[in-house]
Regions:
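P-loop NTPase motor domains
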Residues: 2-11, 25, 33-237
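Conserved beta-strand scaffold positions in the cores of enzyme catalytic domains, especially
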Residues: 15-22, 34
Length: 237
Protein backbone atom coordinates (compact mmCIF):
# COMPACT_ATOMS: atom_id res chain seq x y z
CA UNK A 1 0.00 0.00 0.00
CA UNK A 2 2.74 2.46 1.00
CA UNK A 3 4.84 1.40 -2.00
CA UNK A 4 1.98 2.05 -4.40
CA UNK A 5 1.34 5.46 -2.85
CA UNK A 6 4.92 6.65 -2.41
CA UNK A 7 7.05 4.52 -4.73
CA UNK A 8 7.29 7.23 -7.42
CA UNK A 9 7.37 10.26 -5.15
CA UNK A 10 10.76 11.31 -6.57
CA UNK A 11 9.07 11.82 -9.94
CA UNK A 12 6.81 14.37 -8.31
CA UNK A 13 9.50 15.97 -6.16
CA UNK A 14 13.18 15.13 -6.86
CA UNK A 15 14.07 16.18 -3.31
CA UNK A 16 11.99 13.37 -1.85
CA UNK A 17 12.81 9.67 -1.96
CA UNK A 18 11.11 6.49 -0.83
CA UNK A 19 12.88 3.37 0.42
CA UNK A 20 11.61 0.30 2.25
CA UNK A 21 13.38 -2.30 4.34
CA UNK A 22 12.17 -5.81 5.04
CA UNK A 23 13.08 -8.93 7.00
CA UNK A 24 11.41 -11.05 4.34
CA UNK A 25 14.11 -12.38 1.96
CA UNK A 26 11.45 -13.18 -0.64
CA UNK A 27 10.41 -9.54 -0.96
CA UNK A 28 12.29 -8.34 -4.05
CA UNK A 29 10.84 -4.83 -3.88
CA UNK A 30 12.56 -3.87 -0.62
CA UNK A 31 16.06 -3.93 0.77
CA UNK A 32 16.87 -6.59 3.35
CA UNK A 33 17.38 -5.04 6.76
CA UNK A 34 21.05 -5.31 7.67
CA UNK A 35 22.63 -4.07 10.88
CA UNK A 36 26.44 -4.21 11.15
CA UNK A 37 27.15 -6.25 14.25
CA UNK A 38 29.92 -3.94 15.51
CA UNK A 39 27.43 -1.09 15.81
CA UNK A 40 25.60 -2.99 18.55
CA UNK A 41 26.53 -2.25 22.15
CA UNK A 42 26.08 -4.22 25.35
CA UNK A 43 22.44 -3.23 25.77
CA UNK A 44 21.63 -4.09 22.15
CA UNK A 45 23.19 -7.54 22.44
CA UNK A 46 21.48 -8.06 25.78
CA UNK A 47 18.13 -7.60 24.04
CA UNK A 48 19.19 -9.73 21.08
CA UNK A 49 20.29 -12.60 23.35
CA UNK A 50 17.33 -12.21 25.72
CA UNK A 51 19.43 -11.51 28.81
CA UNK A 52 17.53 -12.26 32.01
CA UNK A 53 20.01 -11.36 34.76
CA UNK A 54 22.51 -8.51 35.31
CA UNK A 55 25.19 -11.15 35.88
CA UNK A 56 25.18 -11.86 32.15
CA UNK A 57 26.09 -8.29 31.16
CA UNK A 58 29.80 -8.45 32.14
CA UNK A 59 30.17 -11.52 29.90
CA UNK A 60 28.81 -9.58 26.92
CA UNK A 61 31.13 -6.68 27.78
CA UNK A 62 34.11 -9.04 27.90
CA UNK A 63 33.12 -10.62 24.58
CA UNK A 64 32.94 -7.20 22.92
CA UNK A 65 36.38 -6.36 24.33
CA UNK A 66 37.85 -9.63 23.07
CA UNK A 67 36.31 -9.76 19.61
CA UNK A 68 38.53 -6.97 18.27
CA UNK A 69 41.59 -8.81 19.62
CA UNK A 70 40.68 -12.27 18.38
CA UNK A 71 39.51 -11.02 14.98
CA UNK A 72 41.57 -9.29 12.35
CA UNK A 73 45.28 -9.13 11.71
CA UNK A 74 46.70 -8.45 15.18
CA UNK A 75 50.10 -10.23 15.20
CA UNK A 76 49.70 -11.01 18.89
CA UNK A 77 46.38 -12.86 18.59
CA UNK A 78 47.95 -16.21 19.57
CA UNK A 79 49.59 -14.62 22.62
CA UNK A 80 46.25 -13.23 23.78
CA UNK A 81 44.51 -16.55 23.19
CA UNK A 82 47.25 -18.37 25.10
CA UNK A 83 46.93 -15.93 27.98
CA UNK A 84 43.16 -16.37 28.27
CA UNK A 85 43.37 -20.16 28.01
CA UNK A 86 46.26 -20.35 30.46
CA UNK A 87 44.46 -18.28 33.09
CA UNK A 88 41.37 -20.48 32.79
CA UNK A 89 43.44 -23.67 33.08
CA UNK A 90 45.46 -22.29 36.00
CA UNK A 91 42.26 -21.44 37.89
CA UNK A 92 41.18 -25.05 37.50
CA UNK A 93 44.55 -26.49 38.50
CA UNK A 94 44.62 -24.38 41.68
CA UNK A 95 40.94 -24.82 42.52
CA UNK A 96 41.54 -27.42 45.22
CA UNK A 97 39.04 -29.84 43.70
CA UNK A 98 39.61 -33.57 43.46
CA UNK A 99 42.30 -34.56 41.00
CA UNK A 100 39.90 -36.38 38.70
CA UNK A 101 37.66 -33.32 38.44
CA UNK A 102 40.65 -31.06 37.79
CA UNK A 103 41.96 -33.37 35.09
CA UNK A 104 38.57 -33.71 33.40
CA UNK A 105 37.96 -29.94 33.42
CA UNK A 106 41.42 -29.15 32.07
CA UNK A 107 40.94 -31.69 29.28
CA UNK A 108 37.51 -30.21 28.51
CA UNK A 109 38.93 -26.68 28.23
CA UNK A 110 41.93 -27.65 26.11
CA UNK A 111 39.81 -29.83 23.86
CA UNK A 112 37.68 -26.84 22.88
CA UNK A 113 40.19 -24.01 23.33
CA UNK A 114 43.75 -24.55 22.18
CA UNK A 115 46.58 -23.23 20.07
CA UNK A 116 49.59 -24.97 18.58
CA UNK A 117 51.60 -23.99 21.67
CA UNK A 118 49.03 -24.65 24.38
CA UNK A 119 47.06 -27.84 23.85
CA UNK A 120 46.73 -31.38 25.14
CA UNK A 121 49.40 -32.38 22.62
CA UNK A 122 51.82 -29.61 23.58
CA UNK A 123 55.26 -30.99 24.41
CA UNK A 124 56.60 -30.49 27.92
CA UNK A 125 60.34 -31.00 27.86
CA UNK A 126 62.36 -32.21 30.82
CA UNK A 127 65.96 -33.41 30.92
CA UNK A 128 65.98 -36.89 29.44
CA UNK A 129 62.41 -37.15 28.15
CA UNK A 130 59.50 -35.37 26.54
CA UNK A 131 55.81 -35.81 27.36
CA UNK A 132 52.61 -34.28 26.11
CA UNK A 133 50.53 -32.02 28.32
CA UNK A 134 47.84 -34.70 28.54
CA UNK A 135 50.35 -37.33 29.67
CA UNK A 136 51.37 -35.03 32.52
CA UNK A 137 47.79 -35.11 33.85
CA UNK A 138 48.30 -38.68 35.04
CA UNK A 139 46.73 -39.48 38.43
CA UNK A 140 48.65 -41.91 40.65
CA UNK A 141 47.26 -44.64 42.92
CA UNK A 142 46.88 -42.18 45.79
CA UNK A 143 44.59 -39.99 43.70
CA UNK A 144 47.08 -37.17 43.12
CA UNK A 145 48.23 -35.44 39.97
CA UNK A 146 51.83 -36.58 39.85
CA UNK A 147 53.09 -33.63 37.82
CA UNK A 148 50.96 -30.82 39.24
CA UNK A 149 53.93 -28.49 39.78
CA UNK A 150 55.31 -29.20 36.32
CA UNK A 151 51.97 -28.53 34.64
CA UNK A 152 51.34 -25.35 36.64
CA UNK A 153 54.77 -23.96 35.77
CA UNK A 154 54.25 -24.79 32.10
CA UNK A 155 50.87 -23.04 32.01
CA UNK A 156 52.26 -19.96 33.77
CA UNK A 157 54.71 -19.38 30.92
CA UNK A 158 51.79 -18.32 28.73
CA UNK A 159 50.39 -15.71 31.12
CA UNK A 160 51.18 -12.11 30.23
CA UNK A 161 51.28 -10.08 33.43
CA UNK A 162 51.08 -6.81 31.49
CA UNK A 163 48.02 -7.86 29.46
CA UNK A 164 45.10 -5.57 30.27
CA UNK A 165 42.08 -5.16 28.00
CA UNK A 166 41.36 -1.70 29.37
CA UNK A 167 44.80 -0.44 28.34
CA UNK A 168 44.42 -1.42 24.70
CA UNK A 169 43.41 1.25 22.17
CA UNK A 170 39.95 0.74 20.73
CA UNK A 171 39.95 -0.95 17.33
CA UNK A 172 37.23 -0.49 14.76
CA UNK A 173 36.94 -3.60 12.61
CA UNK A 174 34.25 -5.61 10.89
CA UNK A 175 33.33 -8.94 12.46
CA UNK A 176 30.69 -11.61 12.03
CA UNK A 177 28.39 -13.55 14.34
CA UNK A 178 30.90 -16.41 14.15
CA UNK A 179 33.67 -14.06 15.30
CA UNK A 180 31.52 -12.83 18.16
CA UNK A 181 30.67 -16.42 19.06
CA UNK A 182 34.37 -17.24 19.38
CA UNK A 183 34.92 -14.15 21.52
CA UNK A 184 31.93 -15.13 23.66
CA UNK A 185 33.40 -18.58 24.29
CA UNK A 186 36.72 -17.07 25.37
CA UNK A 187 34.85 -14.59 27.56
CA UNK A 188 33.03 -17.47 29.24
CA UNK A 189 36.18 -19.35 30.19
CA UNK A 190 37.87 -16.14 31.34
CA UNK A 191 34.88 -15.51 33.61
CA UNK A 192 35.29 -18.95 35.19
CA UNK A 193 32.32 -20.75 33.68
CA UNK A 194 33.65 -24.14 34.81
CA UNK A 195 34.29 -23.14 38.41
CA UNK A 196 30.65 -22.93 39.42
CA UNK A 197 27.49 -24.71 38.29
CA UNK A 198 25.54 -21.53 39.03
CA UNK A 199 27.80 -19.45 36.79
CA UNK A 200 27.62 -22.11 34.08
CA UNK A 201 23.81 -22.08 34.07
CA UNK A 202 23.36 -18.34 33.46
CA UNK A 203 26.51 -17.85 31.36
CA UNK A 204 26.39 -20.76 28.96
CA UNK A 205 22.89 -19.85 27.79
CA UNK A 206 24.40 -16.76 26.10
CA UNK A 207 26.71 -18.95 24.05
CA UNK A 208 23.85 -21.28 23.14
CA UNK A 209 21.62 -18.42 21.97
CA UNK A 210 24.40 -16.75 20.01
CA UNK A 211 25.28 -20.05 18.35
CA UNK A 212 21.64 -20.59 17.43
CA UNK A 213 21.43 -17.11 15.89
CA UNK A 214 24.68 -17.54 13.95
CA UNK A 215 23.39 -20.77 12.43
CA UNK A 216 19.85 -19.62 11.73
CA UNK A 217 18.51 -17.91 8.59
CA UNK A 218 18.37 -14.69 10.63
CA UNK A 219 22.15 -14.33 10.46
CA UNK A 220 21.71 -12.47 7.14
CA UNK A 221 20.43 -9.44 9.03
CA UNK A 222 23.88 -9.05 10.64
CA UNK A 223 26.20 -10.19 7.84
CA UNK A 224 28.61 -7.48 6.71
CA UNK A 225 31.95 -8.00 5.01
CA UNK A 226 33.45 -4.52 5.25
CA UNK A 227 33.69 -2.06 8.10
CA UNK A 228 31.29 0.87 8.03
CA UNK A 229 31.01 3.61 10.63
CA UNK A 230 27.79 4.45 12.42
CA UNK A 231 27.53 7.83 10.66
CA UNK A 232 28.04 6.29 7.22
CA UNK A 233 25.50 3.56 7.99
CA UNK A 234 22.90 6.14 9.00
CA UNK A 235 23.62 8.25 5.92
CA UNK A 236 22.92 5.26 3.70
CA UNK A 237 19.56 4.49 5.26
Amino acid sequence: EYTRALGNVDNVNPNMHYKTYTTNPDNVNSEILNIPLWLLGVDDLALLLDVTTPNQLPIIEKALSLVSILTGDDPDVIKYKNDIIARAVLDILLSGHQSTKIRDQVIAVLTKFNTKDLSLDAKIVQPGYVRTFKQCLYIDKTGKLMEMELVVNFVKTFIMDDFNLEDRPEKFIAYTLKDLETAMDFALISEGILKSDKVYDYANVLSVRLHALANSPNHVFFDSNAYISKDTYLDRL
